[in-house]
Design a protein with these regions (language model features):
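C-terminal transmembrane helical hairpin of 12-TM major facilitator-type secondary transporters
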Residues: 120-165
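Helix-to-loop junctions at the C-terminal end of transmembrane segments
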Residues: 107-120, 203-204
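Pair of pore-lining "gating" transmembrane helices in MFS-fold secondary transporters
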Residues: 54-75, 152-156
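A late C-terminal transmembrane helix in Major Facilitator Superfamily
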Residues: 171-208, 214-215
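Loop-to-transmembrane helix entry
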Residues: 86-104, 179-183, 213
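A membrane-interface helix-boundary motif in multi-pass transporters
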Residues: 2-15, 199-219
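C-terminal membrane-cytosol helix-exit motif in multi-pass small-molecule transporters
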Residues: 9, 14-36, 225-229
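Flexible cytoplasmic inter-helical loops of multi-pass small-molecule transporters
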Residues: 25-51, 237-239
Length: 239
């Protein structure tokens, strides 16, 4: 929107989305193992969701998903306001380029599984949140370089922890895996919606230091939850 109206920008984005959707439709291979189930009642869905929510290890993973997006979205939502203001006065285009740090997620999430096979998934999630904690602390600096480096660390840690947490859902749920995954995504987006919005109050009242304190608090809660997760020894959810 720095060079065009918001209408033109949205039209361009819409066109890109349509192009990607068409490519997805044409290039995605057919499912090999999917078997459609007929006659599933609403009661069945409620029972499946309740069973997953009643399982403490799955519930902790859902909480981790909530905390992940809470930190990630809150940081990205309000760091833009900080960089628009003095002493940085970055333009919309310059700030948008910082979001290229998302590409770090392609690398970190790809290698997370291989490293987790060697050191363990619990340790990998701890590593991911520790990386996020380091990144959040780096954004306290007045140096633009360190702020951007901090954003990169948060992004890397986020995708590491998310890749491991989401894979744990499939491992812990031995049946109705689609229901288990849908609950993870529900908590995942609730974090970005609730805490991401609440962060605006923190930003207005306490500035960037308040955002940092909020994110540190959330990361510490996540680490406590991760440490409390017991190893998987037996099937977790049965119907």
């Amino acid at each position: 929107t720095e060079f065009f109206s918001w209408r033109i920008s949205m039209t361009i984005l819409g066109g890109i989305c349509l192009f990607c959707a068409f490519g997805f439709l044409k290039l995605l291979p057919n499912s090999r193992n999917f078997i459609a189930q007929q006659g599933l009642s609403f009661k069945f869905h409620l029972h499946a969701w309740y069973a997953h929510l009643s399982h403490i290890r799955l519930l902790k993973i859902y909480g981790i998903g909530f905390l992940l997006t809470s930190v990630f979205v809150t940081l990205f939502n309000y760091v833009t306001f900080r960089l628009f203001a003095a002493p940085y006065h970055l333009s919309q285009t310059q700030i948008s380029l910082i979001f290229l740090s998302y590409s770090l997620g392609i690398i970190s999430s790809s290698i997370a599984g291989n490293i987790a096979d060697r050191i363990g998934k619990k340790q990998m999630m701890i590593l991911g949140f520790s990386c996020m904690l380091l990144g959040v602390l780096l954004t306290l600096s007045a140096s633009l370089f360190l702020i951007i480096l901090g954003i990169g660390c948060v992004t890397t840690g986020f995708f590491i922890a998310h890749a491991i947490a989401s894979s744990r859902v499939g491992e812990l749920a031995t049946s109705s895996k689609g229901h288990a995954t849908s609950l993870y995504l529900l908590f995942y987006y609730l974090g970005s919606s609730i805490v991401g919005a609440y962060g605006g109050n923190i930003w207005q009242s306490h500035g960037w230091n308040g955002i940092v304190i909020l994110n540190i608090f959330l990361i510490l809660i996540a680490l406590i939850v991760i440490f409390s997760i017991k190893p998987l020894h037996s099937p977790s959810v049965t119907h």
